[in-house]
């Protein structure tokens, strides 16, 4: 059995996910009265988004995380705001994920919103210095795990014809970056997979929505030591608010900051050598990982 933390009512009343429309008549996802599952939810922006979801009126927030102490501390804080529960889950272990989802359904009910936020980075290494263990773990947690978790939630969401899956990728999944090649590869995979699922659901007129988020470096400790010449390191509170707003608006793809969308355009129009010169040398993107330390 997967360990869990937090008291929870024995009797559950299912509350259907509420929908409303914005000023343009577009259907929005309501966090209020929704059950929100967040992987990597006991630290960083995962924890912040969990708190914000409760503040927005989520009927419950469920967090999956590998760190048992962080889970306990997070749930203690969350329970001051609303209903929360935590499970110790190794998202790189498929059997653990499957068992955790079944336990989550039994004890918490249906998941309305899934936020794939768990991730790791091993940086400041050129590719030939990466170990097989580094590669396997990074790809497993960053790329495979979001698919495996979504594979548990999505059939139930489709059956109910409502739900939302948000996957946190990275700006490194749009623009190549030296000394983080494996991390970049994992995030390119997330973007390609997540947006493809969005199209699959859209083509069948499903009310299940998919949002892919590609943020720049966020100041959470995960990227300690990163230096950015042109773009500021993102504030975790503001970034978390933008992600939740993207979910509410059913935004298909959200780059943070917005200027990264311009780089995507330039990447498609400019010769590779020109793009490398502008982004790598002038803007300094290719040297951001030179002094990377990461979370201790």
Label each PLM-derived region with a short phrase.
Residues 68-69, 88-99, 132:
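The beta1-alpha1 cofactor-binding region of Rossmann-like NAD(H)/NADP(H)-dependent oxidoreductases
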Residues 125-127, 131-137:
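Substrate-binding pocket helix/loop in short-chain dehydrogenase/reductase
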């Amino acid at each position: 059995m997967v360990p869990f933390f937090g008291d929870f009512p024995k009797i559950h009343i299912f509350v259907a996910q509420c929908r409303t429309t914005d000023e343009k008549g577009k259907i929005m996802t309501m966090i209020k009265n929704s059950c929100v599952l967040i992987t990597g939810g006991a630290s960083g922006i995962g924890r912040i988004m969990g708190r914000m979801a409760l503040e927005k009126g989520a009927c419950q927030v469920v967090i999956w995380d590998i760190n048992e102490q962080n889970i306990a501390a997070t749930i203690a804080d969350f329970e001051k705001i609303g209903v929360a529960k935590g499970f110790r889950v190794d998202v790189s272990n498929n059997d653990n994920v499957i068992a955790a989802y079944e336990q989550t359904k039994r004890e918490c009910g249906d998941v309305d919103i899934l936020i794939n936020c768990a991730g790791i980075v091993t940086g400041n290494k050129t590719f030939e210095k990466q170990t097989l263990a580094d590669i396997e773990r990074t790809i497993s947690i960053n790329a495979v795990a979001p698919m495996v978790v979504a594979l548990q939630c999505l059939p139930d969401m489709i059956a109910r014809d409502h739900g939302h899956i948000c996957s946190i990728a990275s700006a490194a999944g749009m623009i190549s970056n030296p000394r983080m090649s494996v991390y970049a590869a994992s995030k390119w995979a997330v973007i390609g997979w997540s947006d493809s699922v969005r199209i699959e659901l859209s083509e069948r007129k499903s009310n299940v929505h998919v949002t892919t988020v590609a943020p720049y470096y966020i100041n959470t400790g995960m990227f300690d030591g990163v230096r950015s010449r042109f773009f500021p390191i993102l504030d975790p509170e503001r970034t978390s608010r933008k992600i939740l707003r993207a979910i509410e608006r059913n935004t298909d793809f959200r780059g943070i900051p917005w200027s990264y969308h311009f780089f995507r355009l330039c990447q498609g129009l400019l010769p590779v050598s020109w793009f490398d010169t502008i982004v790598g040398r002038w803007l300094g993107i290719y040297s951001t990982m030179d002094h990377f330390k990461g979370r201790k």
